[in-house]
Amino acid sequence: MLRPMTILRWVLAVGLLGSTACKRQPVSPFCPKGMREAPTWSDAGKSVWCEAPDKSRAQWIEWHPGTTKPRQSCAFHDGRSEGSFAAWHPGGKLWVQGQFAAGVKVGKWKQWDADGNEVAEGDYQTGRLVAGAPVAGMALCEKVARP
């Protein structure tokens, strides 16, 4: 499991490195290397949908309204949530962190309050809580998938 600051650094690095990834095609500064923004699925100033040329992989990043602070970020593979998920409080501190596999929560998920205190930790297998406490349902990535 990645540490909270590691994910935040990754999201910021994607923004800094993405702009140099491809010079011949329009690339959002928030898209990972090898992906480009899909304007139809992005919402200017609110979120960005990045996808691989073959559309098999995608990354979605949403910002808190009226700010440049990330609200949540997740990756997709073949239309399902796959990989790291992170959500942040409006003040910028990590709120929820976990992993998706085949569109469902797996492994250790954690939740923090706005002051950075851990308030819940749960272990998930195929989307079901098997140990610990349930983690917030902020994970819109469970619902967001390109048709």
What does each model-identified segment do?
Residues 1-6:
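N-terminal secretory signal peptides that target proteins for export/translocation
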Residues 9-19:
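Bacterial N-terminal signal peptides
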Residues 20-147:
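Glycine/tyrosine- and acidic-biased, solvent-exposed loop/turn segments at the edges of beta-strands
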